[in-house]
Regions:
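Short, small/polar-rich loop/turn modules that mediate ligand/substrate recognition or access, typified
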Residues: 34, 39, 99-101
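Non-catalytic, hydrophobic alpha-helical segments
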Residues: 84-85, 91
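A short C-terminal helix-loop "cap" of Rossmann-like NAD(P)-dependent dehydrogenase/epimerase domains
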Residues: 58-73
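Active-site pre-Tyr helix/loop in NAD(P)-dependent dehydrogenases
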Residues: 1-7, 72-75, 109
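Catalytic loop of short-chain dehydrogenase/reductase
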Residues: 1-21, 26-27, 31-35, 47-48
Length: 115
């Protein structure tokens, strides 16, 4: 799982570099492992409501913070872990047997607006 910070949208250059490296690794491993029938893809989630926010925010403030970010997403809501998991399950299925080396933006349309 990558992050959209790979495109330099993070205030942390180290974090952005690590995520960009993950994107490059995904593409290169896809090429290297294709002959063995192994597919390699990545998901790049937008803002997703997960327990990680409890590490740096008061629990009481998290719901309001997430709500304030709904309008940032073209689909009008912050993502859930289930949203990301469903995309991963799809990528693991035979329905995507011809997909490899792809970075999937799972972000309610944020990257579609920014490109």
């Amino acid at each position: 799982i990558g992050a959209q910070a790979a495109l330099g949208d993070s205030p942390s250059s180290a974090y952005s570099m690590a995520k960009a490296g993950l994107h490059a690794l995904t593409r290169n491993l896809a090429i290297e492992l294709a002959s063995a029938g192994i597919r390699v893809n990545a998901v790049s989630p937008g803002i997703v409501h997960t327990p990680i926010y409890e590490g740096f925010m008061d629990k009481a403030d998290i719901a309001d913070a997430m709500k304030s970010l709904n309008d940032f997403h073209p689909l009008g809501r912050v993502g859930t872990a289930e949203d990301v998991a469903n995309t991963i399950l799809f990528l693991l299925s035979d329905k995507t047997s011809w997909v490899t080396g792809a970075i999937w933006d799972v972000d309610a349309g944020i990257m579609a607006v920014r490109r």
